[in-house]
Swiss-Prot record:
The enzyme's E.C. designation: 1.4.1.13
Record-given protein name: Putative glutamate synthase [NADPH] small chain
Reactions accelerated catalytically: 2 L-glutamate + NADP(+) = L-glutamine + 2-oxoglutarate + NADPH + H(+)
Keywords noted in UniProt: Amino-acid biosynthesis, Glutamate biosynthesis, Iron, Iron-sulfur, Metal-binding, NADP, Oxidoreductase
Positions contributing to [4Fe-4S] cluster binding: C33, C37, C43, C47
Subunit structure: Aggregate of 4 catalytic active heterodimers, consisting of a large and a small subunit.
Remaining remarks: Glutamine binds to the large subunit and transfers the amido group to 2-oxo-glutamate that apparently binds to the small subunit.
Cofactor(s), names only, from the UniProt record: [4Fe-4S] cluster
UniProt pathway annotation: Amino-acid biosynthesis; L-glutamate biosynthesis via GLT pathway; L-glutamate from 2-oxoglutarate and L-glutamine (NADP(+) route): step 1/1; Energy metabolism; nitrogen metabolism
Gene source species: Cereibacter sphaeroides (Rhodobacter sphaeroides)
Cofactor binding, per record: Binds 1 [4Fe-4S] cluster.
GO molecular function (one): glutamate synthase (NADPH) activity
Length: 413
């Protein structure tokens, strides 16, 4: 995945703090990966000790402990370069991919400016992932360290509206697109526009803003005292159900159209949610919503698993005549994310995209169809994991350095 030094972590955990090596690559953002990576389906899921029946090495907890110790002792320092270079890079998106690239490029001496639509850097690390999984001061201290290293942040900047893509390109020698995917999938169902039927990201963003002390226009985005139904089976759905429990919902149910074994989210997160009081309703999907002034219930259609699709995954089929109404005061749709139409939004028709709308980039160099423009993370892969975005950002930074070292680019400067 992100080339995590797992054996090194285990060895360091055995040492006293005074003997631990302080050369651990801080640009790998271990303090973040140790908290939010789904280790149960990555490194821990492939642990040979687990496969032998002795229980996995909990590398996520070890990684978190080691890096927290390093931060507490001041061993993680800003990555200031040995010498400054005149070339500059503009990065669009202050999420994990953009931050990882900014760190690597700044360490190499380049002048780095990060543009982001939000008022705080971090992207989904700040506004999407709940604070009980990723404490916001952990993200803030990483951003602060990048600022101390000389990375410039331009916030509240929506590219295509506040600043054109061409303007950014004209100001920098290279550009990295790391916007993530923010277009939320919707349902084409009766009652979907009713008050109390909300999108997952809107709900999670409101919750995170409250934790910062921001004034939030409620607009039904608080689960306190409500019967909550979350629709979806991915990691975002798990974040929603666990947030609703913490907000004091009277009941929280999660509808998923397949069974437990076929859900895309982390099984560890499902177990955590169940322990906290969430009820999972498998083989169930919404047909529509009942609403007066606001949502009152979800019309649930029961499903069964049918024949496999082209990927080998069994397709859900509707069981006719088995519909029922699940009472709800708040229905949260966590159906996944799709890429925005960046060529249209940014006025760059020559930026090539795939048939899924993601940016088409070379899988080795991350170069796009535009010279000197690179892309990483979810805007290339589709909705994926933070650890992949971090690795992409580091790898793209090296490609940008290679590009700027080319004779033609040097001559042009």
């Amino acid at each position: 995945m992100a080339k995590e030094p797992m054996l090194q972590f285990v060895k360091m955990a055995r040492e006293t703090p005074e003997k631990r090596p302080r050369s651990l690559r801080s640009q790998d953002f271990h303090e973040i990966c140790g908290r939010i990576c789904p280790q149960d389906r990555l490194c821990e899921g492939n642990c040979v000790i687990e496969q032998s029946g002795h229980g996995t090495v909990t590398i996520g907890a070890v990684e978190k402990y080691i890096t927290d110790t390093a931060w507490e002792n001041g061993w993680v320092v800003p990555g200031k370069p040995a010498y400054e270079r005149s070339e500059s890079v503009g990065i669009i998106g202050a999420g994990p991919g953009g931050l990882a690239a900014a760190d690597a490029l700044r360490r190499a001496g380049l002048q780095v400016t990060v543009y982001d639509r939000y008022d705080r850097a971090g992207g989904l690390l700040t506004y999407g992932i709940p604070g009980f999984k990723l404490e916001k001061d952990v993200v803030a201290r990483r951003v602060e360290q990048l600022e101390q290293a000389g990375v410039q942040f331009v916030l509240n900047c929506n590219v295509g509206e506040d600043l054109s893509f061409d303007a950014i390109r004209g100001q920098h020698d290279a550009v990295l697109i790391a916007t993530g995917v923010y277009k939320q999938r919707d349902l084409a169902a009766p009652g979907v526009g009713s008050a109390g039927v909300v999108q997952a990201l809107s709900y999670l963003t409101a919750s995170n803003r409250r934790s910062f002390g921001d004034e939030v226009d409620d607009d039904g985005l608080d689960a306190s005292g409500k019967r909550v139904v979350v629709i979806g089976g991915g990691d975002t759905a798990m974040d929603c159900v666990r947030t609703a429990i913490r907000q004091g919902a009277t009941s929280v149910k999660c509808l998923y159209r397949r069974d437990r074994a076929n859900m895309p989210g982390s099984q560890r997160e499902v177990a955590n949610a169940e322990e906290e009081g969430v009820e999972f309703v498998w083989l169930s999907a919404p047909r529509g919503f009942i609403a007066g002034d606001a949502v009152e219930g979800v019309i649930v259609q029961k499903m069964r698993l049918g024949e496999p699709d082209a990927t080998g995954r069994q397709m859900p089929e509707i069981i006719e005549g088995a519909d029922y109404v699940e009472p709800a005061d708040l229905a949260i749709m966590a159906l996944g994310f799709e890429p925005e139409d960046l060529p249209t939004l940014w006025g760059v028709p020559d930026l090539t995209v795939t048939r899924w709308g993601t940016i088409k980039a070379d899988f080795r160099t991350h170069a796009t169809s535009l010279p000197g423009v690179y892309a990483v993370g979810d805007i290339v892969r589709g909705a994926s994991l933070v650890v992949w975005a971090i690795r992409d950002g580091r790898d793209a930074a090296q490609s940008i350095l290679d590009y700027l070292a080319q004779p033609a680019v040097v001559a042009a400067e």
